[in-house]
Amino acid sequence: MKRMILAAALVATALSTSMAWAATAPVQKMEADEVANEQMVLYFETGMIGKSVWLVDSRPAGKFIGGHIPGALSLPLDLLKKDAASADKLGIPKTGKVIFYCAGRECTLSVDSAAIFRKMGYLDAWVYRNGVPGWSQKAQPLLAEEAFVKKGNLVLIDTAPAKDSIVTASNKLVQLSLSDLKGDKGQMALGTLSKNAPLVVIDRGDMAAVNAALEELRERDFRRLAYFPLSAWTGTLAPAPALTALSWAPVYGPGQVAPKVFEEAVAAGKFILDVRPAADFARGHFKGAVNVPIEELEKDFAKIPKDVPVFVNCASGAKSQKTFDILGRKGYANVSYLDAEVSCKGELCSIKE
């Protein structure tokens, strides 16, 4: 994001432009059980999460450890469906206000979780429909877990020069003061780095410094951002390596394909399997896609061919990965899946990894 010089003329132009856009932009309709971005931020900033408001992340555990709203509890929808007692283990009083979230408005994991909780007697159950994208849109921090750091293929950012830090063979480390991060040294280290690279700022007990570093990284258009408390690290510390220009490439698991590969499959007319609910599919989907909601997959899997490549998508990657596993157990060896956020209007779809 290019920095703007806040000259009076530019401010006036920006204001007039934003006012004109506001007059024509569609208003997002709030649902009856929905918590808005501003309310969610207020709960966080006033320290209510975990005290008078309970926040539950309905995404798979692998997504949770990569970055979640601070104070959130992890309860994947799949686990909740398999083991109702998993809800009790969270220690949430049935009279308490509990809010579920996942990967944004296209993701229904949070909606389904809230519905289950209401049936279990939690009457004050809400949904933060904007989820992680909405939280990030408000420039709020996401907290990573140690398991994510140990998993590797990250870029760690430490703004405490000359101090021992988290040095591992599977991650890369940039150790610069905040001023250097904003300057030429930061540009040298990060200037050619993929904007999709996951960056984790090391928290040494100063959240103001963490937020300043995260803001600088947002200014540089990095979007996969989180922070991790050094106090939570159980490994050893070591001196940081010499500063170099960094590069990064994604590592895909079995069956997972890059967004570009998936888009090429759509363009080539390959068999695209959309496992979202029928109502979501009706609002928009990839051109030529076939809808078999994951809830119906066990009885309708025969609709899916075994003799041609099959590419699976959902809204966030959670259901598509599960579909890959289900079909694999049924003998399908021709399935690939997209683990990314997907948003569609009609047949116009965007993918955000």
Residue ranges of model-derived segments:
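Rhodanese-like catalytic fold shared by cysteine-dependent sulfurtransferases
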Residues: 4, 20-42, 62-100, 104-271, ...
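Mature N-terminal segment immediately following signal peptide/propeptide cleavage
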Residues: 41-46, 53-62
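Bacterial N-terminal signal peptides
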Residues: 7-17
